Structure formats: C-alpha cells, structure tokens
C-alpha cells in the first residue's frame, strides 16, 4: 500500500467510506455547482462533453482519477471498480454513471482510453475522460484529489486512490478508497439515492 492509499484509507470510517452533506456541520467534500468546473472533456467513445452540464448535473455519479500506463494503484482500482459496476448491474448508464479521468491527458487520447477500458471489461455507463491538461488539473484540484505535500502531489505515480461518489440532485457526496470492498462501495452509492440507509 503506498502512502496515498494509506492516507485515503485512514481518512474514512471503519467500512471505508465517509459521507459529507451541506448543512450538517460536517466538512463539505464537494459543493455544487461552483466547485464543479464545467470544462470540456473528451470521452473514450470520442464524444465531447461538458463536465458539469453533461456528466454531473442531477445525477448519481462516481469519479476517480487514473492513467493508462500507471503500474501502481490504477490497474487494481479499475478492476475493483469494474466489480462495482457489475454489482450495480443495469443501473449503470441508466441512473448511475461512472467516470474515470486521466491524470495524463497528453498521453491518454480517446483511443488509448478506449483500449484501456476494453482491457478491463468496462461496460456501458462508465466513461473514461481526457481533456486539456490545464482543465484536467483544475478538475483534480477542485474535486479534492490533492495531497497536502506538494512534492508528493506533483508525482503522478503517487496519485490519490480514492473514488468520489454522490448525488448532485441531493447535494450528497462521499468518498472512499477505490480498493474498498466492491459490494460496500456499491451499497454506499445506492445510499446516495436518499431512499435508503446503509445496513
């Protein structure tokens, strides 16, 4: 386990997940929509989208960062999130949407991301995203995927292995290590609907 995975794991509760909601007195993980930059991105399917308007607004979503040539945490994270996608079944792409954003947009073209997604058995409803480097960096920082140590933060190979998930319509957001038990991650994503509580 690298330092970032350890920090992420230590920052969340015993089951590996932590929720934040506006107005509860808890630290706000992400506010809407001001903290969601509406930058242009390209999907692994070749479409151009706006981050907030097209991907986040009114939806239940997951967001994580990765890059295709990563040999550290990324392959395990992607494989684990593929199990989350399977656990959520046909809801992914219908009313739950998954997004993985490359940390190396200068390398990860839509074609590269398409190959990466195919190699990991990614199904419809999960988009891999690239864009202009400055826009991707803005997203990373505004979404909170930042290490407090500037030297560590500058090292892409030590990026934070966390998945952010939430419901924009309810302004309910949480995060957990992307290597948490996939069934637990799926359960807490479903909790974001507001009609249920975790068992």
What do the PLM-derived regions correspond to, one by one?
Residues 5-21:
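N-terminal export signals
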Residues 17-38:
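N-proximal helix/coil linker or "cap" segments that precede and/or mark the start of modular domains
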Residues 40-60:
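A short beta-strand-turn-helix
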Residues 55-73:
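Short active-site neighborhood of thiol/selenol oxidoreductases, capturing the structured segment around
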Residues 78-98:
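Conserved helix-turn-beta segment immediately C-terminal to the redox Cys motif
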Residues 95-107, 125-134:
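Thiol-based oxidoreductase modules, predominantly thioredoxin-like and allied folds used
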Residues 115-160:
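Short, internal strand/loop/helix patches
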Residues 153-199:
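Thiol-/selenol-based redox modules, centered on thioredoxin-like
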């Amino acid at each position: 386990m690298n330092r970032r995975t350890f920090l992420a794991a230590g920052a969340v509760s015993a089951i590996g997940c932590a929720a934040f909601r506006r107005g509860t007195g808890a630290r706000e993980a992400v506010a809407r929509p001001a903290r969601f930059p509406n930058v242009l991105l390209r999907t692994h399917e070749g479409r151009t989208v706006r981050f907030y308007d097209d991907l986040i607004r009114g939806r239940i979503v997951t967001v994580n960062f990765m890059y295709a040539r990563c040999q550290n945490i990324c392959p395990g994270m992607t494989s684990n999130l593929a199990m989350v996608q399977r656990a959520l079944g046909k809801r992914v792409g219908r009313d739950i949407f998954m997004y993985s954003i490359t940390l190396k947009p200068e390398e990860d073209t839509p074609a590269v991301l398409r190959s990466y997604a195919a190699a990991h058995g990614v199904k419809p409803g999960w988009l891999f995203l690239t864009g202009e480097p400055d826009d991707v960096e803005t997203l990373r920082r505004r979404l909170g995927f930042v290490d407090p140590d500037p030297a560590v933060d500058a090292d892409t190979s030590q990026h934070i292995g966390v998945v952010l998930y939430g419901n924009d319509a309810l302004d309910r957001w949480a995060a957990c290590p992307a290597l948490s038990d996939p069934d637990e991650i799926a359960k807490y994503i479903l909790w974001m609907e507001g009609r249920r509580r975790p068992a």
